[in-house]
């Protein structure tokens, strides 16, 4: 007599699903972080596309002056944006079910919160998925560490800055010109160009571009010849080959003579660590700078700091930036009741004309 033992299909199905999720043989690795990443990024992308095309104007300032951001309301690819949620909403969580109607939700900029929250969860999950795949393959975890730099930057402009300023209406709009507007207003209100963390970020981005171009051009110029003049040099490399495809000694000698010896790396591993670390650390500092300025710890103020012998101001670049910032601020605050205090013409009235005696 033959006895057949069959496992319960439910448990077997769940095990198959777990094996599929964590398998490194799939064309695209899913992972448990991917189970969270895929639906959130799909939701954010879908809502962004629909809102960018067809969303009605949003009362961003909370003063019944709606701002149109979608293509169907007269914008183009450059000027269009998903407008941030209304200042009347502030920092309140504003899902669809919190509004009295869909029209109210759209008028108050609900799609912005939907896109941003799903997007942030999605990129956090993507970073976790990078770590998860590295772990499965036995690799070091530095890929997700490098990715943490743009994640920190996105978190700073979409989450930390609105928290510090008290409203999601101060977050960065989701569009090209909206991004530029955010940058101009940020300079006007926080003097970011005079903040040392922003300077470190500029050095990180521009320096990273320079080092990447230098490295790529040096490697391309010192490739080991494997092809004829009539063939593409790319045919001289076979994926997985053990031989070096370029002569690092030649590249080191060239760059050492071009500048000086110790400006050139003689270790490929330390070189590539430097290429990764430089822009990552710079963008970390930028994100940290935006996060501190969110709570109004602003850039340095050197306005009218240099005087001549008669006490007259000698304008410096700091004064030029200050005048530009005042102009940008008055254009941004276009209503009388929001007129910037530092542009008020009248002298401020002291609360007490005489300090009370203590003791």
Swiss-Prot record:
- Which Enzyme Commission numbers does its entry carry? 1.10.3.9
Report the leader peptide range.
Answer: none
Q: Where is this site: Cleavage?
A: 344-345
**Major place of localization?**
membrane
Q: Which residues bind a quinone?
A: 215, 264-265
**Annotated membrane topology:** Multi-pass membrane protein
> Its catalytic activity?
2 a plastoquinone + 4 hnu + 2 H2O = 2 a plastoquinol + O2
Residues recorded as binding [CaMn4O5] cluster, renumbered to this chain, are 170, 189, 332-333, 342, 344
Q: Which domain of life is it from?
A: Bacteria
Matching PROSITE patterns: REACTION_CENTER (PS00244)
Q: Which parts of the chain span the membrane according to its record?
A: 29-46, 118-133, 142-156, 197-218, 274-288
Please give the Gene3D superfamilies that the UniProt record associates with this protein. Photosystem II protein D1-like
How is this chain modified after translation? Tyr-161 forms a radical intermediate that is referred to as redox-active TyrZ, YZ or Y-Z.
Q: Which UniProt keywords apply?
A: Calcium, Chlorophyll, Chromophore, Electron transport, Herbicide resistance, Iron, Magnesium, Manganese, Membrane, Metal-binding, Oxidoreductase, Photosynthesis, Photosystem II, Thylakoid, Transmembrane, Transmembrane helix, Transport
Q: Name one Pfam family in it.
A: Photo_RC
Q: How does it assemble?
A: PSII is composed of 1 copy each of membrane proteins PsbA, PsbB, PsbC, PsbD, PsbE, PsbF, PsbH, PsbI, PsbJ, PsbK, PsbL, PsbM, PsbT, PsbX, PsbY, PsbZ, Psb30/Ycf12, peripheral proteins PsbO, CyanoQ (PsbQ), PsbU, PsbV and a large number of cofactors. It forms dimeric complexes.
* Described function: Photosystem II (PSII) is a light-driven water:plastoquinone oxidoreductase that uses light energy to abstract electrons from H(2)O, generating O(2) and a proton gradient subsequently used for ATP formation. It consists of a core antenna complex that captures photons, and an electron transfer chain that converts photonic excitation into a charge separation. The D1/D2 (PsbA/PsbD) reaction center heterodimer binds P680, the primary electron donor of PSII as well as several subsequent electron acceptors.
Supply the name of the protein: Photosystem II protein D1 1
Per the UniProt record, the source organism is Synechococcus sp. (strain CC9311)
The beginning of the lineage is: Bacteria, Bacillati, Cyanobacteriota, Cyanophyceae, Synechococcales
